[in-house]
Amino acid sequence: MSNDNKKVYTLEEVAKHNSKDDCWLIIGGKVYNVSKFLEDHPGGDDVLLSSTGKDATDDFEDVGHSTTARAMMDEYYVGDIDTSTIPARTKYVPPKQPHYNQDKTPEFIIKILQFLVPLAILGLAVAIRIYTKSESA
């Protein structure tokens, strides 16, 4: 396979080849005409057709193709892709977390109240029990 005389295609040009009779894929920066392979593809032709018009590298790698499958690709190679025509992937940026209050005083007070209020209720209940027991005796 000689890359010297192979054409460089734009994404728009490759995207036009998206039918069962004319199917091109972009994998690893290279363009492949897989039209003749559609019927023989173990995953069916729909899998290949759904990957047209975009960079199908991730789709190809996610399946985990064998070395034999990778070697077969050479016979379908028609050229390279102009990488400047492929839209850049947007990276996931997690939402910024709100800054937490460095002054922990309100949280500290809440924790104390969570401990003291039930303790006060328990103390009040014990006091009422003792008072009512001593009244009846």
From Swiss-Prot:
Pfam family, one: Cyt-b5
SUPFAM superfamilies the UniProt entry points to: Cytochrome b5-like heme/steroid binding domain
Major localisation: endoplasmic reticulum
Domain Cytochrome b5 heme-binding residue range list: 6-82
Subcellular location: Endoplasmic reticulum membrane; Microsome membrane
Molecular function terms from GO: heme binding; metal ion binding
Regions that span the bilayer: 108-128
Positions annotated to bind heme: H41, H65
UniProt key word Iron: yes
Alphabetized SMART domains for the sequence: Cyt-b5
Keyword vocabulary terms for this entry: Electron transport, Endoplasmic reticulum, Heme, Iron, Membrane, Metal-binding, Microsome, Transmembrane, Transmembrane helix, Transport
Repeat as UniProt keyword: no
Membrane topology classification: Single-pass membrane protein
Domain of life: Eukaryota
Described function: Membrane bound hemoprotein which function as an electron carrier for several membrane bound oxygenases.
Protein family according to the UniProt entry: Belongs to the cytochrome b5 family.
UniProt name for this protein: Cytochrome b5
Organism: Oryza sativa subsp. japonica
